[in-house]
């Protein structure tokens, strides 16, 4: 969850009233934020937010705006927003190459002037940029933001799909690199190039003098894209793959700049190929949010109160939300900087917060229900007890791992495995489809402990299943491993027979074709003709892959199928 540090004096100046740290802590509660401390040396307040629905609160200006509105009921208005059929005068243009529709289609921007940036303001802007791009922007994939000194930029700006060999000097360096070299050598390229590197061409922002402004969403130009203390005229752009998310991010930033004291000058984005949009140009910041209908009866039914329409509207006003009635229906108008009203329930939540959480008293439930464990959980607990009773030690593993451990070392193919599309590290690239690799990896680092080793886990596995709605199926499996000089197929067969005897389940065995077993020493487990698992002696080839030099036998069964058959 987002954590921010803001200067207390800047924050209180924007609210227009002084508060103690305890009072600030209490003011933060309605907005799902916690006071996490005050550093007297730096003068900063530390705040942690408990959800990501309100990115407009992640700056000192946005948070102060909401608290000020909550306390005094004054809804701020921003007259620089364009609306459908009412475009404001624009002061620059961004021309979008039609090839960008398949790469990173959306870019919107504005100009800001009239205030000299000081060091604290610059620090706050950079922090907010990082929080917005990392959390709301999903590590720049969904949304990324750039800020520049507009005095160095000649409009119109072109947003083009460029050759990977195009060169410029990236921010923080003093030599030219190609876009491909930036991906491979620059710290930001190494961190974020996964977003665009699979395309034949890369996004590039050029001004009218053909100077590189930035390589979004990776890095700005060192010549143009470096914002400094003392700058007074700025250009701000947001790129993204989601139309509404990109517009909202720009709207939030524009409102923040305005609240700081800047004048906001709109910029027009021109799409040469609208690729399905119902417009060819858009003047931004642009108000796109839709009104949401609410019913007074539904509000009171969910909250358990008896609020009047007037009281409801007053509570919404404290949250910065306008409302009106027309044709016996009630509607809210989302603020310029919010787009989290997806349903009437979201409106009711704001009414509740505006009314104050202390206004609602706990009530005993009117319906009596009895909770109990699911059949799967009861069965799993019984299995755990049986395994421990037979001398096995329970293990708990991570559900994610590497291709090397899950596939290559096991001598199997990857057709049923789920792969993470943009893993942070190859060690967590796949979702496990079996627990056996985890058990073998534990065994590979346990040779110093006395034999025999007997370990097990009851845990989740996930498989690719194109017939399922989500494309995957998740199961609970039981797997165990036995290792030692005397461990053989007969030993594990005895344990398997004992386990199913106490589970009161009849099984039939047939020879397994699994490639990680020794040929002829592996068995599939059938219940009423259905394959529910297997067991056997691990082949020397697989043992060698894991660095194990003592015989191992393993067992794995699908508990979901056992429950359905029991």
From Swiss-Prot:
Entry keyword Nucleotide-binding: yes
Residue ranges of every copy of the B5 domain listed in the record: 287-362
Keyword terms: Aminoacyl-tRNA synthetase, ATP-binding, Cytoplasm, Ligase, Magnesium, Metal-binding, Nucleotide-binding, Protein biosynthesis
Pfam families to which the protein is assigned, alphabetical: B5, PhetRS_B1, tRNA_synthFbeta
NCBIfam families, per the entry: pheT_arch
Similarity-based family: Belongs to the phenylalanyl-tRNA synthetase beta subunit family. Type 2 subfamily.
Record note on quaternary structure: Tetramer of two alpha and two beta subunits.
Name used for this protein in its record: Phenylalanine--tRNA ligase beta subunit
